[in-house]
UniProtKB/Swiss-Prot annotation:
The species this protein was found in: Pectobacterium carotovorum subsp. carotovorum (strain PC1)
Assigned keywords, A-Z: Isomerase
Name of the protein in question: Ribose-5-phosphate isomerase A
Family: Belongs to the ribose 5-phosphate isomerase family.
Quaternary state and interactors: Homodimer.
Encoding gene, per UniProt annotation: rpiA
EC number(s) reported in the record: 5.3.1.6
Role description: Catalyzes the reversible conversion of ribose-5-phosphate to ribulose 5-phosphate.
Keyword Iron-sulfur attributed: no
Pathway(s) served: Carbohydrate degradation; pentose phosphate pathway; D-ribose 5-phosphate from D-ribulose 5-phosphate (non-oxidative stage): step 1/1
SUPFAM superfamilies hit by this protein: D-ribose-5-phosphate isomerase (RpiA), lid domain, NagB/RpiA/CoA transferase-like
Pfam families (UniProt xref): Rib_5-P_isom_A
Recorded catalytic activity of this chain's protein: aldehydo-D-ribose 5-phosphate = D-ribulose 5-phosphate
Length: 219
């Protein structure tokens, strides 16, 4: 199977976790896009979705799925999204698509987080994929210097403005042994909106696309 076929397989497999008459949290990226396609096939069975990006909102609406603002819901039954990396503790790096802040808000609202990935995203130690940090523009240089102190090499993601109007620093060369501590430390730097480490709130279930089929990993 190609990588895209693996992504499609896990996107459709995630439908098993969607209950009727609920509002579904929906992520961003190529794997999440397959889940949105799958969601379109049961759109009359659900109330709608809360979306983590303008791109996902556009795709949901094009399929006729109602989109709710996060402020309109008290909680979500399930949130389905991909990841750039996931370790054995179900902690993730996310934010390659620059939607990390909204993704983190939706994950906090959700009772269950289903991570959908192909097997290439599974790692023993997080950090080979550059760690995205969303930053208020005026704090970019200050935050970059603070990230250097952590041993990372921050790179400004040129030409990218998040849906919230902020910028992204991608931190290279981090070997993240204690993901919760790193998440808390970076989130405490003034000017940081959020970091793309999902460690305090990791995934509850990972659906992993492999050549043998979809493998289910439970926290």
């Amino acid at each position: 199977m190609t990588q895209d076929e693996l992504k499609k397989a896990v996107g459709w497999a995630a439908l098993d976790y969607v209950r009727p008459d609920t509002i579904v949290g929906v992520g961003t990226g190529s794997t999440a896009a397959h889940f949105i396609d799958a969601l379109g096939s049961i759109k009359h069975q659900i109330k709608g979705a809360v979306s983590s990006s303008d791109a996902s909102t556009e795709k949901l609406k094009s399929l006729g799925i109602p989109v709710f603002d996060a402020n309109e819901v008290d909680s979500l039954d399930v949130y389905v999204d991909g990841a750039d990396e996931i370790n054995g503790h179900m902690q993730m790096i996310k934010g390659g698509g620059a939607a990390l802040t909204r993704e983190k808000i939706i994950s906090a609202l959700s009772r269950q987080f289903i991570c959908i990935v192909d097997a290439s995203k599974q790692v023993d130690v997080l950090g080979k994929f550059p760690l995205p940090v969303e930053v208020i523009p005026m704090a970019r240089s200050y935050v970059a210097r603070e990230l250097v102190k952590l041993g990372g090499q921050p790179v400004y993601r040129q030409g990218v403005v998040t849906d919230n109007g902020n910028v992204i620093l991608d931190v290279h060369n981090l070997n993240i042994m204690d993901a919760i501590a790193v998440e808390n430390h970076i989130n405490g730097i003034p000017g940081v909106v959020t970091v793309g480490l999902f460690a305090n709130r990791g995934a509850d279930v990972a659906l992993v696309g492999t050549s043998e089929g979809v493998k289910t990993v439970v926290k």
